[in-house]
């Protein structure tokens, strides 16, 4: 009798565990779908904020299996990403990073190397005004002196904690850093 009770109890536990696993699988699937929908919304918001062509992209969809991102125009036609200019492609990549960070709900630092190199003036302005100040609690920018002009530096100054310049010393074969950004701390030469 005791063995029958054990067998029945084990069978009940297995059934219960199977049901719990099924519920968890369904929950994970729904959570994944919800996060993907949220990512689509955030990505569209970021692209509309960063791209200077109004209504270039009016909808974003993400495939649930492959996670491939499809951009759509106002007529809901798919826009091949290779038809975007190099600057628009960079803004797309930046938008994806921002949308992922927002979707995670966690503050993530951004480290960006030569962020403005391939951008036209309009996209540069958008990055300076709409991205760098708001991208994260911590944004580290590795740029050249030609990317962040004195004008851009002045615009970013209220958001800067510190800035450093790196100077290569050819005779010594090494690089030294100093406080400031190609100018002194106030952005003056």
Task: Indicate residue ranges for each PLM-predicted region.
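GG-anchored amphipathic helix commonly corresponding to the ABC/SMC/Rad50 NBD signature/C-loop
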Residues: 46, 86-111
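Short polybasic amphipathic segments
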Residues: 67-73, 163-167
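Active/binding-pocket-proximal capping segment
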Residues: 63-65, 87, 110-118, 145
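Hydrophobic, well-ordered secondary-structure elements that form the walls
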Residues: 47, 92, 113, 127, ...
């Amino acid at each position: 009798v005791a063995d029958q009770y054990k067998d029945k109890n084990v069978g009940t536990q297995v059934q219960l565990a199977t049901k719990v696993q099924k519920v968890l699988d369904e929950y994970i699937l729904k959570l994944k779908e919800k996060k993907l929908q949220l990512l689509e919304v955030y990505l569209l918001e970021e692209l509309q904020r960063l791209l200077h062509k109004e209504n270039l992209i009016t909808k974003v969809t993400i495939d649930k299996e492959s996670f491939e991102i499809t951009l759509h125009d106002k007529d809901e036609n798919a826009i091949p990403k290779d038809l975007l200019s190099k600057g628009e492609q960079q803004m797309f990549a930046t938008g994806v990073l921002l949308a992922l960070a927002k979707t995670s709900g966690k503050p993530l630092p951004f480290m960006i190397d030569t962020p403005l190199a391939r951008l036209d003036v309009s996209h540069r302005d958008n990055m300076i005004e709409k991205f760098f100040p708001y991208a994260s609690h911590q944004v580290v920018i590795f740029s050249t002196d030609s990317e962040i002009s004195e004008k851009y530096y002045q615009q970013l100054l209220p958001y800067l904690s510190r800035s450093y310049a790196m100077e290569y010393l050819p005779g010594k074969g090494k690089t030294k850093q100093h406080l400031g950004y190609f100018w002194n701390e106030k952005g003056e030469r």
